[in-house]
From Swiss-Prot:
One of its GO terms (molecular function) is tetrahydrodipicolinate N-acetyltransferase activity. Keywords: Acyltransferase, Amino-acid biosynthesis, Diaminopimelate biosynthesis, Lysine biosynthesis, Repeat, Transferase. The lineage of its organism: Bacteria, Bacillati, Bacillota, Bacilli, Lactobacillales. It comes from Streptococcus pneumoniae (strain Taiwan19F-14). Belongs to the transferase hexapeptide repeat family. DapH subfamily. Catalyzes the transfer of an acetyl group from acetyl-CoA to tetrahydrodipicolinate. HAMAP family: DapH. Pathway: Amino-acid biosynthesis; L-lysine biosynthesis via DAP pathway; LL-2,6-diaminopimelate from (S)-tetrahydrodipicolinate (acetylase route): step 1/3. Its EC number is 2.3.1.89. This is 2,3,4,5-tetrahydropyridine-2,6-dicarboxylate N-acetyltransferase. InterPro entries: DapH, DapH_N, Hexapep, Hexapep_transf_CS, Trans_hexapeptide_repeat, Trimer_LpxA-like_sf. PANTHER family: 2,3,4,5-TETRAHYDROPYRIDINE-2,6-DICARBOXYLATE N-ACETYLTRANSFERASE (PTHR43300:SF10), ACETYLTRANSFERASE (PTHR43300). NCBIfam families: DapD_Ac. GO terms for biological process: diaminopimelate biosynthetic process; lysine biosynthetic process via diaminopimelate. It catalyses: (S)-2,3,4,5-tetrahydrodipicolinate + acetyl-CoA + H2O = L-2-acetamido-6-oxoheptanedioate + CoA.
Length: 232
């Protein structure tokens, strides 16, 4: 399913109105004394559900009261994205929240964190450990390097998100500050901190980032993407 594009106010309302859940997986021994409610899934001696629904069942265990609880969140408002219908390569360990849009043949590497409302264009790679904050937008056939940060904006509502154009390369550990726009075809050097908009087809570097040259044939050759990595 493709997420519906949401503005900041809609995201805030989505989070505020969402049922807060502490999802758990519980493996238990013994017999349950009470019927399992519809909100809990029971497969053999394993329970899946919200802790508030599962906990009363464990209090009524008969014969043996041993159980193990696995959980990864507390009162979470935003579930993780259901990735089954996404036509992209998503590696283990990537954390992608609900209401994220991912284009065809995109690549999301291990450890990437993508927050609610972010958009990733077709053929774009988000490398290991990169962070896309809330509502950050990356165009088509771009590359966000390992450890790079595209700052998110959900509050204040009036703030603008980061927008990255098509065919952009953002180097490892670069940081793009809230509201900054990166023009299509540009390159952000590794470690740069981008505090102002970047026009199309230039290279920026430094802290704060400044234009050091326009894109030339040599730069295009060095920063060319590999289509083979995006083959499904």
């Amino acid at each position: 399913m493709t997420a519906t594009k949401m503005n900041a106010q809609e995201i805030i309302q989505f989070i505020a109105n969402a049922e807060k859940k502490t999802s758990v997986k519980v493996t238990f021994e013994g017999q349950l004394a009470t019927a399992v409610p519809s909100s809990v899934v029971k497969l053999g001696n394993v329970l899946f559900g919200d802790w508030k629904d599962v906990a009363p069942l464990l209090e009524g265990l008969v014969e043996n009261q041993d159980y193990v609880v696995e959980q990864d969140a507390r009162n979470s408002a935003v579930p993780l994205l259901d990735k089954r219908a996404i036509n992209a390569r998503i590696e283990p360990g990537a954390i992608i929240r609900d209401q994220v849009k991912i284009g065809d043949n995109a690549v999301i590497m291990m450890g990437a964190v993508i927050n609610i409302g972010a958009e990733i264009g077709a053929g774009t790679m988000i490398d290991m450990g990169a962070i896309l904050g809330g509502r950050a937008i990356v165009g088509k056939n771009s590359h966000v390097g390992a450890g790079a940060v595209l700052a998110g904006v959900i509050e204040p509502v009036s703030a603008e998100p980061v927008r990255v154009g098509d065919n952009v390369l953002i180097g490892a550990n670069a940081v793009v500050i809230e509201g900054v726009q990166i023009g299509s075809g540009s390159v952000v050097a590794a470690g740069a901190i981008v505090t102002q908009d970047v026009p199309e087809n230039v290279v920026v570097a430094g802290v704060p980032a400044r234009i050091i040259k326009e894109i030339d044939a040599q730069t295009q050759q060095k920063t060319a993407l590999e289509d083979a990595l995006r083959t499904l």
